[in-house]
């Protein structure tokens, strides 16, 4: 079934068309740019995961148009990046957040950020939106292959990582003995390791406390956390979303 999402709000000018199953392709952003969204909904919760993994297909002209649509503070941040890849990640991660807020919560105002005790960004709006918005959470992660954004009414963390060459010394540093054995025995240790890495990084971003000294035992320490891991092997990346159970 095809469905169109549209808005006349000039602050969020993107049109989404079409929607097919769980995959949503944004056919036009400022007339030309393209995105792919894969939403998920947690049981009984307002939550969505959005993925943009066609960064290589975005042209310089599309990037220029995207940057021009940003609020001034975000535009200035994007333009501080020397290379185009950094500008893409900065611009489109913000636009992906705008799209997520619009689709999940019907919020069309472009947000700004405030920062919590440990430096984790929080949403901030200029207008007097409903009290619900004070309890909205988001997290963004990006690598060369993809940008992932998750929005929720509960604390949440996300990490997306490129599947790179397996580094045994790094694996010994971040995995406990049991995890290291599983990775070493895997037919594709680089994939197995990247899964563990995204899970641990997503927990770190969920808690907002930064990486602690007990990284090898992080999954055991936070056994009250639910993890949703997706392998996108054809695109060369893996992502994990973390939130608290209950």
Put a short name on every predicted segment:
Residues 2, 16-40, 48-246:
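Core catalytic alpha/beta fold that binds nucleotide/phospho-ligands
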């Amino acid at each position: 079934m095809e469905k169109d999402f549209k808005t006349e709000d000039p602050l969020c000018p993107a049109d989404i068309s079409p929607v097919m199953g769980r995959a949503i392709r944004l056919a036009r952003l400022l007339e030309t740019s393209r995105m792919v969204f894969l939403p998920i909904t947690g049981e009984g919760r307002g939550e969505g995961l959005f993925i943009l993994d066609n960064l290589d297909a975005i042209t310089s002209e599309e990037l220029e148009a995207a940057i021009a649509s940003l609020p001034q503070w975000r535009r200035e941040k994007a333009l501080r990046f020397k290379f185009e890849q950094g500008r893409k990640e900065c611009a489109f991660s913000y636009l992906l957040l705008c799209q997520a807020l619009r689709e999940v919560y019907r919020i069309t105002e472009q947000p700004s950020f405030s920062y919590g005790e440990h430096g984790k960004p929080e949403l901030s709006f200029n207008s007097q939106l409903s009290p619900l918005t004070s309890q909205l959470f988001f997290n963004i992660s990006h690598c060369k292959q993809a940008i992932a954004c998750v929005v929720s009414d509960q604390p949440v963390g996300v990490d997306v990582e490129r599947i790179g060459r397996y580094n045994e010394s790094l694996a010994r540093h971040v995995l406990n003995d049991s995890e290291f054995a599983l990775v070493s025995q895997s037919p594709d240790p680089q994939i197995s390791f990247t899964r563990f890495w995204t899970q641990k990084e997503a927990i770190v971003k969920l808690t907002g406390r930064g990486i602690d000294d007990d990284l090898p035992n992080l999954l055991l320490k936070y056994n009250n956390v639910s993890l949703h891991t997706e392998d996108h092997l054809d695109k060369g990346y893996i992502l994990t979303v973390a939130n608290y159970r209950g």
